[in-house]
């Protein structure tokens, strides 16, 4: 598995259209930065209390990421450029989490 992205957003400050745009944009961006195809996104709109408008949690395969800090910088840089290109205004926090996955598919 390449990466699993969870986007949590506050519907008071972020529209569903903006969340959809971000979901598709960040999926492609992470695929490009990591050079992997297996990247999927969940966008959620739970009750948000005293949190920033958009939190993005990116779980990556620990075995494939040698330097999480460098990966975070690369993703942040590309995301910043994407925001400008798409006139995307809401602030975004990103969190990169290397994980060791053990999974079975299609059970």
Predicted features, each with a name:
Residues 1-6, 33-60:
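Short edge beta-strands and adjacent turn/loop segments
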Residues 51-86:
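Mid-chain, well-packed structural core segment of small domains
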Residues 21, 25-33, 74, 78-85:
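Generic non-transmembrane alpha-helical segments
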Residues 14-21, 65-71:
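Short, conserved charged micro-motifs
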Residues 11, 60-62, 98:
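Non-catalytic surface loops within mature trypsin-like serine protease
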Residues 2-20:
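N-terminal presequence-like segments and adjacent domain-start helices
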Residues 103-107:
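Short acidic DE-rich linear segments
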Residues 38-44, 84-102:
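A short amphipathic beta-strand at an alpha->beta junction
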């Amino acid at each position: 598995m390449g990466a699993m992205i969870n986007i949590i957003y506050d519907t008071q400050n972020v529209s569903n259209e903006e969340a959809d745009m971000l979901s598709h944009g960040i999926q492609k961006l992470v695929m490009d930065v990591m050079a992997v195809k297996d990247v999927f996104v969940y966008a959620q709109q739970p009750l948000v209390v005293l949190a920033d408008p958009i939190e993005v949690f990116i779980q990556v395969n620990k075995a494939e990421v040698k330097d999480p800090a460098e990966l975070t910088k690369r993703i942040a840089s590309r995301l910043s450029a994407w925001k400008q290109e798409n006139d995307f205004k809401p602030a975004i926090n990103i969190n990169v989490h290397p994980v060791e996955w053990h999974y079975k598919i299609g059970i």
